[in-house]
Amino acid sequence: MLTQGSIVEAIPHAQLPLRYEALPSFEGQHAIALRRLIWLYFWLLIFEGALRKWIVPSLSTPLLVVRDPLVILIYLQALRCRRFPINGPMLGCFLLLVGFILLALVQITTGVGGGVLVAAYGLRTNFLHLPLIFVIPQVFSYADVLKLGKWILILAIPMTALMVLQFESSAGSWMNAATRSDVQQIEFAMGKVRPSGTFSFATGAAHFFVLATAFMVYALAQKRMIYPRWLVWSALLSVLIVQPVSGSRLLVLGCGLVVAGTIAFGMINLGRAQKILGVLVLIGLVFGALSFTGFFREASDVFMTRWNDASDAAGGVQQGIVWRFFGGFFEPFTLLPQAGLIGKGIGMGTNAASAMMTGALVFLLAEGEWARVVLEAGPLLGFSFLFYRVWVAGTVGVRAWSSAKQGKLLAWLLAWDACRSLVTEQISQPTNLGFMVFVGGLCLAALAEDRFSNRIASEPSSRHPVHNLGKGPDSRRRFRGSPLPVS
């Protein structure tokens, strides 16, 4: 029996009547809905902090996990339209989840940890959002990644303006409100508050602008302008202005890693080295021009004061920067005697556990991510979970490196933040967790650049190819093809 779906698959796409082009298949309809759910996840990631701080502060606590039911819905929809991958990384995640559930039961029955709610929140922190890394590339095409990049560059402009206003405002201003009425945003130097933008904390703004830097550099390095020129230039100004204003070493170092990745790309693709050099010179010139303005000099002075104070407090740059990063890998080994065989309780190292058990936001176990995981779950499962994250990061990094050697830039730029986050990110903070999985998924989706480049090369010239993304036949056929491999 012939159905619309069988006709669509049987007839070459270019010969389909218009009525079939306008009516996606049943599977395609679910895939489109799935893509919209992922977009909703992105928008909540950007604006959930604004909801918690300004719009509905009375619901700040439940909004902390507002993306949790959404990510479950994404998984159910992915299963429904056969976009939930069953591969090595996903099976590894499932086996670890089973192990952690069994460990949580042992801890609860032996009186270790904070009880059922704390253990459930710990399992949610470690595993609920992690599979999204592998679902996104099954749904997002390279065109979708560029669309999202355009929105990130658009958002970077008002986000910078908001952070400048927060920088200039007092700690008690409504613009610098925190997600709890009894706390304030952190002051970083000379009475200035570390601005958080629309996010609940400054780390969210840091992740956002590292992502914006990757898309901005990618756009500048292309032979053809993929975004409007005004947008790219405005994003460049925004990214540079926010560096000293942020007061965040994570933001500055993260953007620096993207620039380092750009330099490395030019070194392994000598044919594009001249273009890459031009991008770096342009960034340097704009930065130099900004340094002549009074506001930028003031913000830079405040940031350097914060940098020097933090370095001095930690024993110098070596202790404050280098050891803070690499020391986190050795800390869990020194804490093994405290962890014991089964750990101190899954979820005990999260902010939610400290709020439930003490009523305050304190580190009950450790501040570092590796130490938190090992102290919560003990050495066996703790190091297994950390090794899994390192393995996923290594897989993403190797594939991005292979893409870079073929002259494909975007996945390579995204990988620098994705891999760092997978290895070291403090995922007990929901915004950090959201950016870790989302950037990782975007990086894997960006590996499909070859197909997109071939399609653009075969189409008539356009000033901004991104304007037509998702409108051609490839965007409709995307959901009927095989999922992108991720392992």
Would you name each region that the model predicts?
Residues 33-54, 68-127:
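N-terminal hydrophobic segments of proteins, predominantly signal-anchor/transmembrane helices
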Residues 2-4, 161, 167-171, 263-315, ...:
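A membrane-periplasm/extracellular boundary helix in multi-pass inner-membrane enzymes
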